[in-house]
Design a protein with these regions (language model features):
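Glycine-rich loop(s) and the adjacent beta-strand/alpha-helix scaffold that form part
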Residues: 203-252
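Core beta-strand elements of the Rossmann-like FAD/NAD(P) dinucleotide-binding domain
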Residues: 3, 195-203
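Single conserved hydrophobic/aromatic residue that forms the stacking wall/gate
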Residues: 267-275
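Short beta-strand "acidic-cap" motif of Rossmann-like dinucleotide-binding folds
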Residues: 29-34
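Gly/Ala-rich phosphate-binding loop of Rossmann-like dinucleotide-binding domains
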Residues: 18, 22
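Beta1/beta-strand and adjacent pyrophosphate-binding region of the FAD-binding site
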Residues: 2-13
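Conserved N-terminal/central alpha/beta ligand/cofactor-binding core
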Residues: 35-165, 222
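A conserved short coil-to-beta-strand element within the FAD-binding core of flavoproteins
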Residues: 171-184
């Protein structure tokens, strides 16, 4: 099969790649390949059993059209200070403009217009000042909270829109490798579990997301493609009495406090080993 563009992965990155091409009037033949299922065919047995069944070959919560987004609580963080290295890569101004642009697309497909965490500027200012005195930086981020059911409906609408506008989708289909001719990618080798086949394309977009990170790292290493993994935030959950956080929670829907420890000296038993 031949195509103008083949997109590997139908998570948010792959979805918005196809969506943006259509919005710009592209007439190119676009093919999306996803190892999970179409959204309306995704279901998790844990909803009935209460126990994770470790579904094979894929988890239907994290793979399939829209990735984990369709079964999340549908929170869209609308400030560039939250969520990744995009401001560092393209600058804060462009990052924020891009977030605002993507947010408008979600609204077009039915996302709730209400935004949490805005207003109360004076109360936020006072909380920020108190945080600074405590050696903390307050990050207050507006949140568009779609909710699980609305997130599912929004992504289902996007899926149908792409199909109605000619995007071909191959579900339950895994990318095995890239078709490389010299230093040029000419498409992808695929398998649907029953047969192997290939799609040759003028442009190949690999958008496998966090779930496909190990596979992408392997492919890049095999083909000599320079790459750098992004960071993964690991933290702990600390629960405190409501009275402690009540003021912040009443003013801010969702906030982050970044701590900056004071400089300190660490001594060992030997003064010469001062650090």
């Amino acid at each position: 099969m031949n195509a103008d563009v083949v997109i590997v992965g139908a998570g948010p990155a792959g979805i918005f790649t196809a969506l943006e091409m259509l919005r710009r009037g592209s007439k190119k033949k676009i093919v999306m390949v996803e190892k999970g299922r179409a959204l309306e065919k995704r279901s998790c047995p844990k909803a009935k059993t209460g126990v994770c069944m470790n579904c094979k070959p894929v988890c239907h919560i994290t793979t399939g059209f829209s990735g984990a987004g369709a079964f999340s609580d549908g929170k869209l963080s609308l400030a560039c200070e939250v969520g990744g290295d995009l401001p560092t890569l393209i600058g804060e101004r462009l990052a924020q403009e891009t977030i605002d642009y993507a947010d408008k697309i979600y609204l077009e497909f039915g996302a709730d217009e209400h935004i949490e965490g805005i207003g109360n500027e004076e109360k936020v200012r006072r909380i920020r000042a108190r945080a600074i005195k405590a050696g903390l930086k307050l990050v207050d981020c507006p949140i568009r909270h779609m909710g699980t059911e609305k997130a599912h409906d929004v992504y289902l609408g996007i899926e149908h829109y792409l199909m109605d506008h000619g995007v071909e989708m191959y579900f339950d289909t895994e990318c095995r490798d890239l078709i490389m001719e010299g230093d040029v990618c000419r498409g992808v080798y695929l398998t649907d579990g029953k047969k192997d086949f290939e799609i040759r394309a003028k442009h190949t977009v690999v958008a496998t997301g966090r779930r496909g990170a190990d596979w992408l790292e392997k492919i890049c290493s095999e083909h000599g493609v320079e790459h750098q993994p992004s960071t993964v935030d690991i933290g702990v959950r600390v629960e405190v009495r409501n009275e402690i956080m009540e003021e912040i929670n009443d003013v801010l829907y969702e906030s982050k406090l970044i701590g900056y420890p004071k400089p300190c000296l660490l001594y060992t038993s030997d003064a010469a080993d001062e650090l």
